[in-house]
Amino acid sequence: MDLGICKRCGEFEGSCECGKGEVLLKSEDRKKVSKFLSGLLRHFGRDFGVRLDEDGWAELRDVLKILSERYGVGRKHVELIVKFDPKGRFELKNGRIRAKYGHSVEVRTDWSEGGEIPEKLYHATSPENLNSILKTGLLPMRRREVHMCSSPQEAIEVGKRHSSNPVLLEIDAKGLMQDGIEVRRKGKVYTVDFVPPKFIRVLSFDPRSPNPAKGY
């Protein structure tokens, strides 16, 4: 959806109520900028001269310089992207910006925004990975943490980036924590260093059902 600002309605996503707001980022441009910003803060910042500290923070001015040259956007555009990001991927604070999760570069990941952790979480994977996961557990692979979602629908949506028919897994988050494994909340995503096989259950998924996730 578009992002913009209105003197009457304030910042908005999609359209403002009065219909007189100014669109600052069209939907297509928003996708391009947020995708590049995500990569910059998670994977390839060094290639553009952006330095991340041990907690993943970068100086906002350095990021804005690159985004301005590449896409012609400024601070307000970035603020809107951060505010309305559907998964809460980014954080702005004291003139710095970071991605909360998803890094392939080395940053400290043992922090959490706190709050209640659901007893059950969900992760979707390609069918060809299933046997290995059930034997050895869920590993971060190319990322530094395993990512989990609070709903089956969200997990399937993420899983479809890698497979047209992902397998849905239910994670016993309560069991993980009782076993001393820390589960962290970062934005709308939950992360963990590793999920042992005993905390994983394979689910079927029917989005048309009022109870779409069923174990088997």
From Swiss-Prot:
Pfam families: PTS_2-RNA. Coiled coil: none annotated. InterPro entries: Ptrans_KptA/Tpt1, RNA_2'-PTrans_C, RNA_2'-PTrans_KptA, RNA_2'-PTrans_N. GO terms for biological process: tRNA splicing, via endonucleolytic cleavage and ligation. It comes from the Archaea. This is Probable RNA 2'-phosphotransferase 2. Its EC number is 2.7.1.-. Removes the 2'-phosphate from RNA via an intermediate in which the phosphate is ADP-ribosylated by NAD followed by a presumed transesterification to release the RNA and generate ADP-ribose 1''-2''-cyclic phosphate (APPR>P). May function as an ADP-ribosylase. GO terms for molecular function: NAD+ poly-ADP-ribosyltransferase activity; tRNA 2'-phosphotransferase activity. Belongs to the KptA/TPT1 family. Keywords: NAD, Transferase.
